[in-house]
């Protein structure tokens, strides 16, 4: 029905209408066709590219979300993961995880510390005390300087 009138469609037209209604917008994370290029974070943390051949390595990268058609997006992810590992190591070397985590406030352009209740579990590194979290902010700032990056270059 369209505007109250019944419209007869051929099977081909019906299929086209169904495809138009259910078509999914492609994202950078969709699986590529054979021989199309995608980007991934290599063992050394560097973003590399390869053509999808349908090999086991392609399946593994796609399955664990290490597969993206947008190089810039993957570079940001690689930088984010590197910073997160640096902060995780710092946390482990300084008392381990805890109720404190650090965050960057884009609105004010500065870092903050947030304390969470013990029953809240966060993704990413946490810190055992406010003092250690303050030191972690300095570690993060140093990492940004050493890599000639700003928080806006890394965080999504």
Language-model segments: which ranges?
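Structural boundary micro-motifs
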Residues: 1-156
């Amino acid at each position: 029905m369209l505007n109250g009138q019944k419209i007869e469609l051929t099977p081909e037209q019906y299929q086209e209408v169904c495809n138009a209604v259910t078509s999914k917008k492609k994202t950078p994370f969709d699986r590529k066709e054979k021989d199309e290029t995608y980007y991934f974070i290599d063992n050394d943390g560097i973003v590399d590219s390869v053509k999808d051949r349908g090999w086991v390595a392609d399946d593994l990268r796609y399955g664990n979300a290490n597969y993206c058609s947008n190089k810039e997006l993957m570079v940001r992810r690689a930088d984010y993961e590197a910073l997160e590992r640096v902060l995780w190591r710092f946390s482990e070397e300084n008392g381990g995880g805890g109720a404190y985590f650090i965050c960057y406030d884009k609105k004010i352009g500065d870092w903050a510390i947030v304390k969470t209740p013990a029953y809240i579990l966060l993704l990413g590194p946490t810190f055992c005390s406010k003092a250690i979290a303050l030191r972690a902010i300095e570690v993060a700032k140093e990492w940004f300087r050493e890599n000639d990056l700003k928080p806006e270059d890394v965080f999504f």
